[in-house]
């Protein structure tokens, strides 16, 4: 009897990769995709790695595929932008061993800077897309994706969303298959994409998509559920669950292959229902194609292009139900905030004091944009802080940049910050870059990277030394400082921003949540010395609260003894005690 387990969608994807016989997996962590690799590494049959960025991860998977084995890359939707260069080209080349890219979209922007739809990228790249609707399908579709990849000589994208990635469901486990490795044969016409070869491969790719679209009508992953024919829905992925919840008796065409679309199947389904609704999260990808075929349907006229969908959306827009209005629960506000003891808070308290603006980047330190720290002024994408600062200096001059810095984390610096810093040096820029080194990829759950000295598979390896790396670029002014030494940090910041050349400040202190961090002190208030000035409250540490009489309390269950509040108080109204 097969074993059944309750699995997250991401966990099921990892299981599907295992059962499909995958041998190589590469990724860069990014919510909501991170747990895929964290679960894949549990299977010793699969080599798994954290790559410096998604482009590298995609290329690692491509290399493994060309050599003849089944390989995959996984990333969040904005990571697909970084990986798009190799993705677009490998679509032309095709594969040898099966090749799958898992892309996790984020409707509702729970942890992302935009709400892009990976299906749009896939259409431009001419890469087929599968979209599972629950954990069981997440596992099964992974296996099916590798079969399709090898059958049609194409990379395949498996598209997930935050809700699927982080929802649980029953999954029937099966044994791992061990496909015979494909034999590699030298074939420059297929694998060397210079213009002459690429022109011929483009013709092949167009034919491949047409063939696949024709075959899609008979694919088992596209399912027709004929019930009441007054209402019909075409949907896919997690949105299917909302349709079944709101309209259990409606007819439904659930698409498992969401690009290319099975035109004949869609036309047949549409002809059998009175009113056809297209229910798809984010962009009107289905709707635009279906309407272009002359099929009457209703989509974004009543459904939004923004945010997550829900069963209530259907009840209101389709069934015209008056939903019961309920008062929102009265709960305390929980704005995003840096953790107690976070070294970034110490850095930002200094920048705030000096009235220095920061070009920001992607990571926990993005929270430096919100009050009371209010330091970060811009955030675009991974690695953009340094390039943005450089652009400001070239536009406004050296004097303008004296009260600006770029802030970037150690993992993000490894991701795409190095090229930006190199550009700054090469093009004779001026400006101060602060690398906030907390020895981890903190925002996505403490994954290792090239500068930590440990791989995803737990191997101890030489760590990239960020200080020496910056020096090797020809930067004369590279300084390391303890993030919590605010006196020294303030002195260094003043000194470096005044220089008419590139300088780098590396603030070093491990993330407070890292395993193995041991805290031997706590901070306690001394009320009789307090003059109620509020200096200790300025960094916004959640462990500190203001009492009715103006003195402060420190929650000992939250305090990590970092000492920032103590260092800010010049009157000795906060002390540290051993614990």
Predicted segments — roles?
Residues 106-155, 161, 196, 336, ...:
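Conserved thiamine diphosphate
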Residues 1-135, 226-227, 285-287, 292-506, 512, 516-517:
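Thiamine diphosphate
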Residues 45-52, 93-104, 184-187, 426-439, ...:
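A glycine-rich helix N-cap at a beta->alpha junction
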Residues 36-39, 62, 83-87, 109-116, ...:
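Short acidic, glycine/serine/threonine-rich loops at helix termini
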Residues 2-10, 132-338, 343, 356, ...:
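Flexible, low-complexity linker and terminal segments
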Residues 39-45, 243-253, 468-474:
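Short helix-loop-beta junction
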